Amino acid sequence: MKKLLLLLCIALLCPGCGGKKDNNENVVLPSESPIINEEIKPEETSTPEPSIEPSILPKEDTSTLSNKKIGWYFMKGKDHNQPTFGKDLSVPADKYDAIYLKSNEDKTIYLTFDEGYENGYTAQILDTLKEKNVKAVFFVTGPYLEKEKELVKRMVDEGHEVGNHTINHKSMPTLSDEEVEKEVLDLDKKFHDEYGKSMKYLRPPMGEFSERTLSITKSLGYTNVFWSFAY
């Protein structure tokens, strides 16, 4: 009994022992970090606004990198074979972990759609994808995100990936390092504020890029996604 009373006294004298973690939601763009909750007392706490970090990977010194503008293109393969890509692409996209072609061993097709503006087809595309139970990636711009909220909400609700096509759809090699980051992260923040999700795939506007812009966007945690077929 004396031991029990002694333990109770120690517990009362040390109410802060063990500490308490705040219920924080730390968001590192473009990928979301899990929320870790550890409650000690049943009290209400306010959740701080998620923070936006401009970079999640060490930056490369871009002053040593080429900023020659490269326009992405492909050449159709014969007999339904996979396409080939321009020999003058002086910077191989895969050097910076960009995606443009996957192995055809499993005969998988990845569908991506650029949503720079709405021409009346997206609702039909979403209907067809839903009917066939197929998921796709839709790359949206800032104006599209603002004007086509119903369609973007459908993309999110129906399980599609919404990718970053930058906020103003500018040729990235013409921008400074800071402007490139702003074009990408401003759109990411708007999307996160509206839907609670972060973007992780980027399609450079007009398919124009340079070694410098690939490096910058990779440092932001993005995967650049090009294409091997267009319609």
Tell me the role of every PLM-derived stretch.
Residues 114, 129, 162-165, 202, ...:
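Conserved, mostly hydrophobic/aromatic
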Residues 125-133, 145-165, 217-219:
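Acidic (Asp/Glu)-rich catalytic clusters
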Residues 1-22:
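Sec-dependent N-terminal signal peptides of Gram-positive bacterial secreted proteins and lipoproteins
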Residues 17-111, 118-124, 131:
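N-terminal pre-catalytic segment of deacetylase/amide-hydrolase enzymes
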Residues 106-109, 132-136, 158-160, 197-200, ...:
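Short, well-ordered coil/turn segments that N-cap beta-strands
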Residues 170-231:
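Catalytic domains of cell-wall/extracellular-matrix polysaccharide-remodeling enzymes
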Residues 96-97, 126, 149-153, 184-188, ...:
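Generic structural signal for well-ordered alpha-helices
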Residues 116-120, 140-148, 171-175, 203-209:
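Acidic-and-aromatic substrate-binding clefts and catalytic sites of carbohydrate-active enzymes
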